[in-house]
Curated annotation (Swiss-Prot):
Belongs to the universal ribosomal protein uL10 family. CDD domains: Ribosomal_L10. GO terms for biological process: translation. Pfam families: Ribosomal_L10 (PF00466). The gene is rplJ. This is Large ribosomal subunit protein uL10. InterPro entries: Ribosomal_uL10, Ribosomal_uL10-like_sf, Ribosomal_uL10_bac, Ribosomal_uL10_bac_type, Ribosomal_uL10_CS_bac. Keywords: Ribonucleoprotein, Ribosomal protein, RNA-binding, rRNA-binding. Part of the ribosomal stalk of the 50S ribosomal subunit. The N-terminus interacts with L11 and the large rRNA to form the base of the stalk. The C-terminus forms an elongated spine to which L12 dimers bind in a sequential fashion forming a multimeric L10(L12)X complex. One of its GO terms (molecular function) is large ribosomal subunit rRNA binding. GO terms for cellular component: large ribosomal subunit. Forms part of the ribosomal stalk, playing a central role in the interaction of the ribosome with GTP-bound translation factors.
Amino acid sequence: MSEAIIAKKAEQVDLVAEKMKAAASIVVVDSRGLTVGQDTELRRSLRESGVEFKVIKNSILSRAAEQAGLGDMKDLFVGPSAVAFSNEDVVAPAKIINDFAKTADALEIKGGAIEGAASSKEDIQALASLPNREGMLSMLLSVLQAPVRNVAYAVKAVAESKEDVA
């Protein structure tokens, strides 16, 4: 192989390794068998959520994973592999791909990484069942509001009972 080609591939490995290091979550899938329409729909859904989705050669993925400290992921890079990277929302790629896989039998989740740790297919599917960041924040706020609301109701009840006595 010429030195120019080797340099270009090394640059690709570095670029993918940087994406892997920066990603909050990574989902690796086998998209073999998807129709063009299904693939386009999946890519559009991921793009709308700020998720980058690419088909990358397994040799480049394997070297990039090793370089990014995700050597445990190397077993996933067998057969056709497409990778979804999300830098912000940990749940988004897993949720979108898992939901899409329910309707498109050809899409198979292989595994991935969650916040820098290699994860199995089952871990990714469990992550997909969680609410997204906004959903979790709203759940947290409702939990925090409940005690305050109960105190307010108690104060109101005491005030009403004192009015009834007077």
